[in-house]
Amino acid sequence: MIHRMLKLPERQSCLLFGPRQTGKSTLVRSVLPAGAWTVDLLEHDTAMRYAKDPSLFRREAESKIASGARTIFVDEVQKVPALLDEVHSLIEKHKARFILTGSSARKLKRGGANLLAGRAVMRRLHPLTLQELGESFDLERAQERMYDWKRRG
């Protein structure tokens, strides 16, 4: 795995946004503490259950918190924006730490979603930087490969 320069807060809740395929989920999974609960909203049945009844997420999260989970990771939160209100409530009640990933804060704002102002820090993960790629990245070779790929169609 490529070491990313972005650091997530260790104790505070966090909303991590960025373009698709930039490594948001991979980054979060690499720093999750043991016992964290992960909810993947790319799993259609999971997203549908919570979209149908967002309070189900709160009840399940409270059960996980009661069992000792102190960090809850919700991947692709833009799939079920109503969960942000439940997360807000859970942060207030239980002081649990949430890490939420999504591709577009702008889309959530337009939809009137609760972006947890004052309760979670917002971070943005950009595509890899040259510093993150390090010495193993050969720009000339990459350009040649792109040219070959483009030429072949």
Predicted segments — roles?
Residues 111-153:
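Interdomain motor-coupling "hinge/lid" segment immediately C-terminal to the ATP-binding subdomain
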Residues 1-11:
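Pre-Walker A adenine-sensing motif
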Residues 73, 97-103, 124:
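Structural recognition of the conserved hydrophobic beta-strand(s) that form the central parallel beta-sheet
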Residues 16:
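Hydrophobic anchor at the beta1->P-loop junction of P-loop NTPases
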Residues 39-71:
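Short glycine-rich substrate-engagement loop in P-loop NTPases that contacts/grips substrate
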Residues 24-25:
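Conserved lysine of the Walker
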Residues 65-83:
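Conserved P-loop NTPase "ATPase switch" module shared by AAA+ and STAND
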